[in-house]
Curated annotation (Swiss-Prot):
GO terms for molecular function: rRNA binding; structural constituent of ribosome. Belongs to the universal ribosomal protein uS19 family. This is Small ribosomal subunit protein uS19. The gene is rpsS. InterPro entries: Ribosomal_uS19, Ribosomal_uS19_bac-type, Ribosomal_uS19_CS, Ribosomal_uS19_SF. NCBIfam families: rpsS_bact (TIGR01050). GO terms for cellular component: cytoplasm; small ribosomal subunit. Gene3D superfamilies: 30s Ribosomal Protein S19, Chain A. It comes from Geobacter sulfurreducens (strain ATCC 51573 / DSM 12127 / PCA). The keyword Chloroplast does not apply. The keyword Signal does not apply.
Length: 93
């Protein structure tokens, strides 16, 4: 279910304070663990270091990211491909 419009987008307080302190286009990266925060128009032009569970992924916010969550742009899982079929490898030799 979608969030109620009257509540507005969710942004963690500590992220909102850091964004208010920074100016747009500044080179300083805002480090955050808050993957659940919604990207608002105030975030445009800022770079966030979003934690993916292991390391921080740099995310530069653009206009078309508004309304999405920060965590959507820092994948948590890596796909290394499906396991190879051992039987087919033996037949080829």
């Amino acid at each position: 279910m979608a969030r109620s419009i009257k509540k507005g987008p969710f942004v963690d307080d500590h992220v909102a304070k850091k964004v208010a302190a920074e100016s747009a286009g500044s080179k300083k990266v805002i480090k955050t663990w808050s993957r659940r925060s919604t990207i608002t128009p105030d975030f445009i032009g800022l770079t966030f270091a979003v934690h993916n569970g292991k390391k921080f992924i740099p995310v530069f916010v653009t206009e078309n990211m508004v309304g999405h969550k920060l965590g959507e742009f820092a994948p948590t899982r890596t796909f290394h491909g499906h396991a190879a079929d051992k039987k087919s490898k033996l037949k080829k030799k």
